[in-house]
Amino acid sequence: MTRIFLVFVLTFLAIPWTAEASKNGVIQTDNSYVVGITFKYSGIDELCSGALISPTVIVTAAHCVFDENGNTGTNYQFSIPRKSLEDPIDPNIIPPKLLKVFTSPSLITSGQKKSDDIAFIQLDKPLATTGFIRVATSVDLSSLTSASPIFGYGFGAVYETKSSYSSYPRKYPIDWNSISFTPNSSTIELTSRTATPCTGDSGGPIVATLANGQDVIVGIISGASSVINGCGNQESDNNYHIRITVAIPYMSLVNSVLNQVVPSPTPLAKKITITCIKGKIIKKITALNPKCPTGYRKK
């Protein structure tokens, strides 16, 4: 049986700046916006994660679109939220395709000074019509405290089972460090005492729950420190360190797409009812363009 994503050997962590599914993560079968992304670099299968911020726009990491030589990946496929990566492909449905990629003009993909590790993938048709998540504004970010619930999500490798990917996205807790964040921050380092991303979580969303209960994307996963066997490890401070690319500084790249006016659906043609008379016989005719039968006159 053909399946959406095949099991393959993940190579992301051979790339120095690559992030990683999770150690100590919890599987989420009903998440409405996390997306699994498979593609190829130089013919080699790769896996990343991302988040749907509109019916046709996915935010992910730039290194999930361009390799270290600046070459674009090929054969992109995108999982549908709430669907397992192992669900059979419906041959009667043509899946959305990558239409365009938006990245920062100052993106650096190679060397030691890699930067602006965020990309917005525009699809040629909706991947889903509901359930997507919005990006946190500067006001939202300024309202976060060390007590704010923050979680990372991804389809990457599962530390506990040694699986190279998770069939559904996994959720893991992260601590918010308001000291490391400023209104001009584009990259920040967050920590967790209990969990870390692993290979394949690159581009997965970091999500905060605001005081009003709404979930918003803070940014995307760009990297983890002390990576061994595909997962980050604790530093001397007993914390896992995770590098995040903040999303809001880059929203101008894709606002023109997000703000496009969606044409209203063509209204259904309205049926009209007329009354037709022939002597004492009365008939009511309902149609888009009703006409009285021969011998009848319209009342």
Where are the regions that the model predicts?
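Sec-dependent signal peptide cleavage junction
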Residues: 15-23
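Acidic glycine-/aspartate-rich tracts in secreted/extracellular proteins
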Residues: 63-66, 82-85, 124-129, 155-159, ...
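Positively charged n-region of N-terminal signal peptides that target proteins for export
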Residues: 1-4
